[in-house]
A protein has these predicted regions:
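Residue-level signal for inorganic ion chemistry
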Residues: 56, 101, 163, 194, ...
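ALDH superfamily catalytic-core signature
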Residues: 5, 9-12, 20-28, 188-189, ...
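N-terminal Rossmann-like NAD(P)+-binding subdomain of aldehyde/semialdehyde dehydrogenases
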Residues: 1-128, 302-305, 506-522
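Conserved C-terminal structural/oligomerization subdomain of aldehyde/semialdehyde dehydrogenase
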Residues: 2-4, 17-20, 24, 343-522
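Rossmann-like NAD(P) dinucleotide-binding subdomain of oxidoreductase/dehydrogenase enzymes
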Residues: 119-259, 283, 373, 502, ...
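Alpha-helical structural signal in soluble globular domains
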Residues: 64-66, 77, 98-100, 104-105, ...
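Structural signal for hydrophobic packing residues in well-ordered secondary-structure cores
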Residues: 45, 49, 64-67, 71, ...
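Residues at or immediately preceding the N-termini of alpha-helices
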Residues: 31-34, 53, 71, 257, ...
Length: 522
């Protein structure tokens, strides 16, 4: 082991950093001091990046143990921050994080390892080529609140195992749970590897204004995402933006209506509708419409009040439902209830205007617009009228699902980064699955293999022999002729010379002759 490797392993064995590091003391520093410290650190390769990948993966194993032991404490803080039930906090926040850590322990070495590059042209004789992967450097993560432990935790796992320094701006809506998570992560890390700011909005604005990063990861609304993109564009800082998804569940004629209604409604009401990949509208084939509505209505009627993150969120989703009903939609519950503080009873509205805020998904709560379409093409066309595509679900027969799941043109037409068949939201928890938005839903990949690769950068490396190497300078005419024959360039030049101005080979028929029909052979 090298001296550097031994020093890193010694550092990894140290007791955890004091909790003040990266928190209160960092907040007390002035903007100028922060810029100076950031600049000094950027001038050197950080020691965590110098740690062998095997050492960083071993740290993941110890992190997994700490998260598992601290699961109940994390659940307490999640419930206090955002009001989830204990089961939902455990199943949708803590468990996916533990599964992701386990997956990265098994697969990070493969994803992050470089290797030789095949396909060297013959004229590059004496050269060897490979691609190496190194950390991007210093990563800023601006965290969100709806899955405060799962989303931030996975993003930190990927940035840290790739060897980066990380600075986190916690969400102002989830300060307790994310502070607890950060303290679990900071154990055993070299000092300065993981820092965090205050959780208020001013801290987020100052983070990008006063400091420079090599990559910024943001999860949140499209409006704020645009602001982050504009700020980072001034310094050409790469970003990963995981923004709003207002997607569709497409129910085809051969779908099991009871299964579709149950699966879609479960996704709509999960986490009180505060899931960016949850469906905001169900587009139902007219032939399946009566059975689907019949199956969905009792599920809507049986739903109890959901707790949203704020009174404003509850009021907004209730307003969208009222407007959809006023525009001609039919509430499947029969009445539209007013919110009670942060609590509101989930609702679904059948029919109505395609341009309503409910149909467009202009809310973040447990409400569903149910729209009709005639067949698959019309369903996809209606889905594409809405511009935010993150995760689409398609409900159909098992045989049709198998065929459509392999139809690349159909998958591309849906426009989303994730397509699920006969399920919604839950399959996206697979730790190898990446989330990649397009257009108003963001850009760049987070989670999965693509998200992990995004936390590193490629370096193309070549070594040329000092003895066997391609001669420099322009070769003689005879050597150039041999070169053309060996590379096929001579044949290509003759072929191009035989084409007319339109890029087609001239006909052998006499000029002006009419094309003749082919004579059938007896």
């Amino acid at each position: 082991m090298s001296a550097d490797g031994a020093a890193i392993q010694s550092e990894l064995a140290r007791p955890p950093c004091p909790t003040g590091v990266g928190t209160a003391s960092a907040q007390a520093d002035g903007a100028a001091a922060a810029r100076g410290a950031s600049g000094a650190l950027r001038m050197q390769v950080h020691e965590w990046a110098e740690a062998p990948l095997a050492a960083r993966i071993a740290w993941l194993g110890r992190l997994q143990d700490r998260v598992a032991r601290g699961a109940e404490a994390l659940v307490d803080e999640i419930c206090a921050d955002v009001g989830k039930s204990r089961w939902e906090a455990l199943a949708t926040d803590v468990l996916p994080l533990v599964d992701s850590i386990r997956w990265h322990r098994r697969h990070a070495a493969r994803v992050l390892s470089g290797g030789p590059v095949a396909g060297r042209p013959w004229w590059m004789v004496g050269m060897s080529h490979r691609v190496d992967r190194v950390p991007v450097g210093h990563v800023a993560i601006i965290a969100t609140w709806n899955y405060p432990v799962q989303l931030l935790g996975i993003q930190m796992v990927q940035a840290l195992v790739a060897g980066n320094r990380v600075t986190v701006k916690p969400s102002e809506r989830a300060p307790r749970s994310q502070r607890a998570l950060l303290e679990l992560f900071s154990g055993e890390l070299p000092r300065g590897t993981l820092e965090w700011t205050a959780s208020d909005r001013a801290a987020g604005e100052a983070l990008l204004r006063d400091r420079r990063f090599d990559h910024v990861v943001f999860t949140g609304s499209t409006e704020v995402g645009r602001s982050v993109a504009e700020t980072c564009a001034r310094t050409l800082t790469p970003t990963t933006l995981e923004l709003s998804g207002c997607d569709s569940a497409i129910v085809l004629a051969d779908a099991d209506p009871a299964l579709a209604a149950r699966g879609i409604w479960e996704a709509v009401t999960m986490n009180a509708g505060q899931t960016c990949m949850a469906p905001r509208r169900a587009i139902v084939d007219a032939r399946a419409w009566p059975r689907f509505i019949e199956a969905l209505a009792p599920l809507v009627g049986a739903s109890g009040p959901a707790r949203l993150v704020s009174e404003q969120s509850a009021a907004r989703v209730a307003e969208c439902v009222r407007d959809a009903v006023a525009g001609g939609g039919r509430p499947l519950r029969g009445v539209v209830e007013a919110p009670s503080g942060v609590h509101w009873r989930p609702a679904a509205v059948a029919g109505g205007s395609l341009m309503s805020d409910l149909a467009r998904g202009a809310h973040f709560g447990p409400a569903l617009a149910v729209l009709a379409a005639d067949g698959l093409e019309a369903s996809v066309a209606l889905h594409r009228r809405f511009d935010q595509h993150l995760a689409v679900s398609v409900w159909c027969s098992a045989a049709r699902a198998r065929a459509m799941s392999r139809d690349r043109s159909m998958l591309a037409a849906l426009g989303a980064g994730v397509v699920t068949f006969n399920d919604a939201v839950r399959p996206t928890a697979h730790p190898a699955t990446s989330i990649a938005g397009r257009g108003p839903s963001g850009w760049g990949a987070s989670r999965g293999e693509a998200g992990l690769r995004a936390m590193s950068r490629d370096i193309g490396v070549s070594c040329t022999s000092t003895r066997l190497r391609t001669p420099s300078g322009e070769p003689t005419a005879s050597v150039q002729s041999i070169f053309r024959r060996l590379t096929g360039l001579g044949r290509a030049r003759r072929a191009v010379a035989g084409l007319d101005s339109r890029g087609t080979r001239p006909s052998a028929d006499p000029a002006g002759s009419e094309p003749r029909a082919r004579t059938p052979q007896p």
